[in-house]
């Protein structure tokens, strides 16, 4: 289950990478690094594995922790290949090489030492390496800098990120918002 946990953690961390890259205008996503030395702890109120369907569902107070990084949500679903890719004995869940996509729902929250990302939903396609975060507001913050939109799409392989506004219904401006905090020069 260790490789499986690393992939789940990578999903949460990739959300933060997207925010940092957009705020810093870097051409590539360079911050996606997992610490192989720190243990990964996954907790939820319930874990249901439907091996025949290729689904593992974590529900209720889902927490994924590695070092200072935390991913929280109400539900996390893992979809994995069931085509007999693994000839070994049945396990308590999919191995990392078989995972196709991850979906996180219900108040998605990811935090590192300096960054926070929130959304209503998020998904990560392992084959295409595309991360999508959506919600009434997708908020990315890093050291006082804040980005707000309603849909963030990140091509992890190329570093291309797109943040869409929220449409113009129910008082929303339909525009992406960014707040940048200049660093103090007096010290």
Spell out what each predicted region is.
Residues 1-187:
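Mature-chain termini and adjacent capping regions
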């Amino acid at each position: 289950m260790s490789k499986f946990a690393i992939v789940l953690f990578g999903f949460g961390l990739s959300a933060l990478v997207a925010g940092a890259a957009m705020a810093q205008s870097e051409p590539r996503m360079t911050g996606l690094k997992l610490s192989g030395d720190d243990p990964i702890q996954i907790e939820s109120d319930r874990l249901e594995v439907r091996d025949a369907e290729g689904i593992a569902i974590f529900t209720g107070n889902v927490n994924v922790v590695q070092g200072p990084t935390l991913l929280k949500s109400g539900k996390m679903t893992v979809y994995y290949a069931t085509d007999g890719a693994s000839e070994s004995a049945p396990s308590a869940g999919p191995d990392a090489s078989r995972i196709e996509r991850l979906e996180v729902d219900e108040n998605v929250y990811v935090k590192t030492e300096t960054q926070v990302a929130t959304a209503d939903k998020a998904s990560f396609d392992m084959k295409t390496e595309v991360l999508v975060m959506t919600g009434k507001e997708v908020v990315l913050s890093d050291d006082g800098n804040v980005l707000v939109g309603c849909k963030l799409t990140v091509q992890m392989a190329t570093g291309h990120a797109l943040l869409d506004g929220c449409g113009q219904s129910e008082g929303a401006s339909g525009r992406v918002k960014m707040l940048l905090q200049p660093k103090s020069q007096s010290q």
